[in-house]
UniProtKB/Swiss-Prot annotation:
Location of the protein in the cell: Cell membrane
GO-annotated cellular components: plasma membrane
Keyword Cell membrane part of the UniProt annotation: yes
Protein's UniProt keywords contain Acetylation: no
Region (Disordered): 93-120
Protein name: Putative membrane protein insertion efficiency factor
Keywords in alphabetical order: Cell membrane, Membrane
Origin superkingdom: Bacteria
Chief location of this protein within or outside the cell: membrane
InterPro entries reported in the protein's UniProt record: Membr_insert_effic_factor_YidD
Family recorded in the similarity comment: Belongs to the UPF0161 family.
SMART domains: Haemolytic (SM01234)
Bilayer disposition of the protein: Peripheral membrane protein
Length: 120
């Protein structure tokens, strides 16, 4: 079976998301049965459990688990907390690159477009 360039890794992402459902179920059990027994102490918005559900839903089992582990590593007195949503727009690999010959100017620095870098 050969995948066309149009599928662009979607089979892998769908499989990862489907396998993440079991872990999301475990997180939901924690959120609804164990978490209410403890006082609210999460220093992040969204909470770490909501972050995990969002990351697993958006990025699948492997990348979502990795993002969740990074977030949980921040949980402690050494981090001030605050607003920390899941990152948007993570690429899935070079095979899915749609920008050809610098057609996307959003990522080209001003100096490469012949513009000044600052107005001052």
């Amino acid at each position: 079976m050969s995948l066309s360039r149009q599928s662009c890794g979607r089979v892998v992402r769908v499989t990862g998301r489907a396998s993440a459902r079991g872990l999301i179920f475990v997180i939901q059990v924690y959120r609804h049965m164990l978490s209410p027994l403890r006082p609210a102490s999460c220093r992040f918005v969204p909470t770490c459990s909501q972050y995990a559900v969002d990351a697993l839903t958006e990025y699948g089992l492997l990348r979502g688990s990795w993002l969740t582990m990074i977030r949980l590593a921040k949980c402690g007195p050494w981090h001030r907390g605050g607003w920390d949503p899941i990152p948007e727009g993570l690429t899935t690999g070079r095979s899915c690159q749609t920008d050809v010959d610098g057609a996307n100017d959003d990522w080209n620095p001003a100096s490469k477009r012949g513009e000044r870098e600052s107005f001052v």
